[in-house]
């Protein structure tokens, strides 16, 4: 009986050798393919997968601001202050109805109440929304309070909304948008920061950490979107309460909105602050340069028509 080649015998039993002898030297011998066993997903795994997908969808669905809300939903969401996104969703839905001129819009007392809420997100959204009904005196009075809010983002929204009321009370705040915002600290200690000048910032971006004498750490976050203009307190330096740490340039959208507002309520003495944006010495955006040019022309034209 002829045996298999020695190369196939080393360390292998005869039955394994017989299975592996099909090769180029023995084309008449077929290699037996191993049986493939398919694993079937068990019922519990499928159920868990379905629940995961459904849960993710429901989370998205109930937090997606594009979803229409009924009157009952809006009333419920406005008082659900444990879930800020629900409150904001309701406010957005009200804004959309106001923008469409829907005469059935209600909830004005709730909106004014949110304008006095300690949560910044509620105040800034309420300030923005109230500009969509310039006939409401209760909104007007609420905005006059919000334009003095401690948070700059709330003041800015209120100032822009007041323009719709043809009220120039927010003019100083609109001019402030054109200038770098100074970030100060209420804490004393050593600064630690890795941000570089020119870094893009979102509202809430961590600007620095301050290690106090008692070793506790205080975080300093950006109150506004924009770009880091100048670092005053460098990493490793010590600061005291009220000291300037850095300055922030406003983002393009804020600049554009401020310039649009000043086109309506700006004064001739505001022109020198606007012209650098028109000639491109401050920013290179064509959008900003164009709007700044239009704003200067609007202010000058209004001054000529109404000389003092």
Explain the meaning of each model-derived region.
Residues 2-34:
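N-terminal intrinsically disordered, acidic low-complexity segments at the extreme N-terminus
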Residues 38-39, 64-78, 100-116, 134-148, ...:
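Amphipathic alpha-helical scaffolding segments comprising HEAT/armadillo-like alpha-solenoid repeats
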Residues 82-83, 118-119, 150-151, 181-182, ...:
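Short inter-helical turns and helix N-cap capping residues of alpha-solenoid HEAT/ARM repeat scaffolds
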Residues 86-87, 123, 155-156, 255, ...:
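Residue-level detector of extended alpha-helical repeat arrays and alpha-solenoid scaffolds
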Residues 94-101, 130-135, 162, 166, ...:
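Alpha-solenoid repeat junctions
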Residues 176-191, 206-226, 247-250:
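Short beta-strand-turn/beta-hairpin segments enriched in glycine/proline and small hydrophobics
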Residues 185-200, 228-235:
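Short histidine-centered loop motifs in beta-beta connectors
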Residues 198-207, 236-245:
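A structural signal for short beta-strand/turn segments enriched in small hydrophobics and glycine
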